[in-house]
């Protein structure tokens, strides 16, 4: 059983997984990008992330 979880603490995203699949890597990249973008945006702005 693959276990993966994300912890968001102090604006730092850490992805831990037992299997580094391409999908996991893609989600990790998107999560890191979202955190980086949110740190640059003003309060009240909205980040929308869509996965197809």
UniProtKB/Swiss-Prot annotation:
Tissue-wise expression: Expressed at high levels in the lung and testis, at intermediate levels in the kidney, heart and brain and at low levels in the muscle and liver.
UniProt-recorded Gene Ontology molecular function terms: DNA-binding transcription activator activity, RNA polymerase II-specific; RNA polymerase II cis-regulatory region sequence-specific DNA binding
Keywords tagged on the record: Activator, DNA-binding, Nucleus, Transcription, Transcription regulation
Main localization of the protein described in the UniProt heading: nucleus
Gene Ontology annotations of biological process type: animal organ regeneration; mitochondrion organization; positive regulation of transcription by RNA polymerase II; response to electrical stimulus; response to estradiol; response to folic acid; response to hypoxia; response to lipopolysaccharide
Gene Ontology CC entries for this record: nucleus
Compartment(s) where it occurs, according to its Swiss-Prot or TrEMBL record: Nucleus
Post-translational modification comment from the UniProt entry: Phosphorylation enhances DNA binding.
Family: Belongs to the NRF1/Ewg family.
Function: Transcription factor that activates the expression of the EIF2S1 (EIF2-alpha) gene. Links the transcriptional modulation of key metabolic genes to cellular growth and development. Implicated in the control of nuclear genes required for respiration, heme biosynthesis, and mitochondrial DNA transcription and replication.
Assembly: Homodimer. Binds DNA as a dimer. Interacts with PPRC1.
Protein name: Nuclear respiratory factor 1
Gene assigned in the entry: Nrf1
């Amino acid at each position: 059983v693959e276990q993966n979880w994300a912890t968001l603490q102090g604006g730092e995203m850490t992805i831990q997984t037992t299997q580094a699949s391409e999908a996991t890597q893609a989600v990790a990249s998107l999560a890191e990008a979202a955190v980086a973008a949110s740190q640059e945006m003003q309060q009240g702005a909205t980040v929308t992330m869509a996965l197809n």
